[in-house]
From Swiss-Prot:
It comes from the Eukaryota. This is Regulator of MON1-CCZ1 complex. Positive regulator of the Rab7 guanyl-nucleotide exchange activity of the Mon1-Ccz1 complex, possibly by enhancing its endosomal membrane association. As part of the Mon1-Ccz1 complex involved in endolysosomal biogenesis possibly by mediating Rab conversion, the replacement of Rab5 with Rab7 during late endosome maturation. The C-terminal Mic1 domain consists of an alpha-solenoid structure that acts as a protein interaction scaffold for the CCZ1-MON1 complex. It comes from Drosophila melanogaster (Fruit fly). The gene is Bulli.
């Protein structure tokens, strides 16, 4: 295993939850549903301290309860912390009601059965499921009547079970045939799901080899086993892919090691800890692997590395305090799903965190790294950093094929999100209040155009920037994503800077840039660079039928006749302002143009007002005088203003 350079991609949370360590007087229990840890002294007679994440000083409840004989096997609060369930005997469970944070010890409800109770789980504030050797039964606890009532049951022989609180699913190992059967357990509901396909009907699966968790929102049964050929250990990943579908072996994680292992899931990664080497292996089932018989075989993302060393600050009167270097992968460690590590002897409970930045150093394949970061909850900024490095000066645009693939990966996700947003906007009638709309869940990492523009702006005006921008634009077009304003303006700036006017003309003609008044005006602002730019802008304005702006541009360029023709066709004869066009024609100092424009409006006047004269409201007196002075032969009788 490679532990060089002190690079660690897994770390323990800096502030562990501290509790009384295991001793002759203190027993420690953990409830993985509420994420609460119980330190029970003298069977509860001298105190029970319950701690969990998120509470002030991590203390949830502290109380005492009577020792009713028999060692405590399991202890768990209801979700609202108002009923405490305690199992001391193999065939009974006690329910202690609470008022505030103190128990009502005079109102203990004892529920006894004739079976062997393997364990229990709370499924609601007042409902608990008992899992015994004969089946699963859901009970309602009625404190007011000091009763426990059965509301639902499933009869099945059970050897052991595993529980996934996030999915409310119990995995039952049956007495007959060693089958693994998932069961959905909710309030007043028990639903038996198709059994896990183990391949060999006689295969015996031990409880210690099975982990139940969720990966990418799908329930996963992880089974540790040795490879029949090599003898090395591997993990089978069986996924519950949908209602009514049997959990199927979809992936195999090749550990290539022997010894003791434990499994966590962190940020949708499967983390396999190897005690002998003191390393943790990372697997991502979303990444491609070797496919054999429709099963994907995965190797670790990188060579295994140790969890980051952890120094625990010990209680001390001095301000500096003493630091204890914790033993990693200790034999006293107990792991719970998804990412919990408990050292009962040390009295610490940690959560495992993923360190993204070191992994970016270890995964040299930039495309694979992109695929990896797109699935990480905090991968966006790191992915943007990676892309920024790829387009930076040191690469000088030589990694265009790699960038092309990366753009495809991020834009495929981006396109799905854009399409989903469009569907949500168009599927609802306008009178539906937005508060009632179901909000779309964005992808884990969403790289939008504005994110990319911020990266591209850092390499503006470099020789290869145009090539990278064209590559990104082509990728957007491939996924039918329209270029937005900021990106369109940046592409225009680069093309104009490089005098790539033919490329600019093609992009506009194929509508690959945003067609808007703002972008067209941005083009016009650069028209002094080359006359071709002005025509490109006019072409764009024509596509969006922004005739008013085109007319202004043409008038500014002295193309008065063209502007007049467009105004007549787009605005209608009666709405064409005579003064504006006569003034523009006068500014050209071309008598022929002025004459043509003047005569056009005379004919208009004749058609609209049955006279050649201009209405006084149009304020054309100076142009009438200019016409009369310039073309006296046309006006033997001076034309008045009507």
């Amino acid at each position: 295993m490679d532990n060089s350079n002190g690079i660690h991609y897994i770390e323990l949370t800096p502030n562990p939850i501290r509790f009384d360590a295991v001793s002759q007087l203190t027993n420690v229990f953990f409830d993985d549903s509420n994420k609460q840890i119980f330190a029970v002294r003298s069977g509860g007679a001298t105190g029970v301290v319950v701690k969990g994440p998120g509470s002030p000083d991590d203390v949830v409840i502290s109380f005492c309860m009577s020792d009713r004989g028999g060692a405590i096997r399991s202890i768990k609060f209801s979700p609202d912390n108002q009923i405490l369930a305690v199992q001391r005997k193999e065939n009974s469970v006690e329910f202690i009601c609470f008022q505030g944070d103190q128990p009502l010890l005079q109102d203990i409800i004892t529920h006894q059965v004739k079976t062997l109770i393997h364990g229990f789980v709370w499924v609601h504030n007042r409902e608990v499921a008992l899992i015994s050797n004969t089946g699963v039964e859901v009970y309602t606890v009625v404190p007011e009547k000091r009763q426990v009532r059965s509301v639902k049951s499933l009869s099945i022989g059970i050897k052991w079970f595993a529980w996934c609180c996030d999915a409310n699913v119990a995995l039952l190992c049956t007495s007959e045939g060693n089958s693994l059967i998932p069961v959905l357990v909710k309030q007043k509901v028990i639903t038996k799901l198709p059994k896990v396909d183990l391949g060999n009907p006689s295969r015996d699966v031990q409880e210690s080899k099975v982990t139940l968790g969720q990966v990418y929102g799908v329930l996963a049964v992880l089974i540790l086993q040795s490879n029949s050929t090599t003898g090395l250990m591997e993990v089978e990943v069986h996924l519950l892919n949908g209602p009514g579908l049997a959990p199927r072996k979809c992936h195999v994680l090749r550990l290539s090691l022997l010894g003791r292992f434990a499994i966590n899931t962190v940020d949708n990664l499967i983390v396999v800890h190897h005690q002998a080497s003191g390393t943790s292996l990372l697997f991502d089932i979303s990444l491609p692997g070797e496919v054999i018989n429709e099963i994907t075989y995965h190797t670790p993302i990188t060579p295994g590395r140790s969890i980051k060393p952890f120094g625990l600050k010990l209680p001390s009167l001095s301000p500096d305090g003493q630091i204890l270097q914790c033993e990693l992968y200790s034999t006293h460690w107990v792991l719970f799903q998804p990412n919990i590590v408990i050292d009962a002897k040390l009295g610490c409970m940690w959560f495992l965190n993923l360190c993204i930045e070191p992994l970016c150093q270890l995964i040299s394949d930039r495309i694979r790294l992109t695929e990896f970061l797109l699935q990480r909850s905090n991968g966006k900024q790191m992915l943007l950093k990676v892309i920024g490095q790829l387009v930076d000066d040191q690469y000088k645009g030589t990694l265009l094929p790699v960038l092309e693939t990366i753009f495809s990966r991020i834009n495929k996700i981006y396109a799905s999100w854009v399409q989903l947003e469009l569907q949500n906007q168009t599927a609802q009638p306008s009178n539906v209040k937005t508060t009632t709309l179901k909000q779309s869940t964005p992808p884990i990492v969403l790289i939008e155009q504005l994110d990319m523009v911020q990266i591209f702006q850092r390499i503006a005006r470099r020789p290869y920037t145009e090539s990278i921008l064209m590559l990104y634009l082509q990728s957007l077009n491939k996924f039918n994503i329209a270029a937005q304003e900021e990106l369109s303006k940046m592409i225009i700036s680069e093309l104009i800077s490089n005098r790539s006017f033919d490329t600019l003309r093609r992009l506009v003609s194929y509508s690959m840039l945003l067609e808007s008044k703002s972008v067209a005006c941005f083009l016009l602002s650069h028209s002094n660079v080359d006359t071709a730019i002005s025509q490109v802008a006019i072409d764009m304005l024509g596509r969006i039928e922004a005739h008013e702006i085109i007319i202004e541009v043409m008038l500014g360029q002295g193309k008065v006749i063209d502007a007049l023709r467009l105004a007549k066709n787009s605005m209608g004869l009666e709405k064409v302002p005579a003064r504006k066009f006569l003034e523009a024609a006068h500014k050209t100092k071309d008598d022929l143009i002025f004459h043509s424009v003047y005569r056009f409006f005379q004919m208009r006047n004749l058609k609209l007002y049955e006279t050649l004269s201009f209405p006084k409201a149009e304020q054309c007196t100076e142009f009438i005088q200019h016409y009369n002075n310039t073309f006296p032969a046309d006006n033997p009788t001076r034309q008045p203003v009507s």
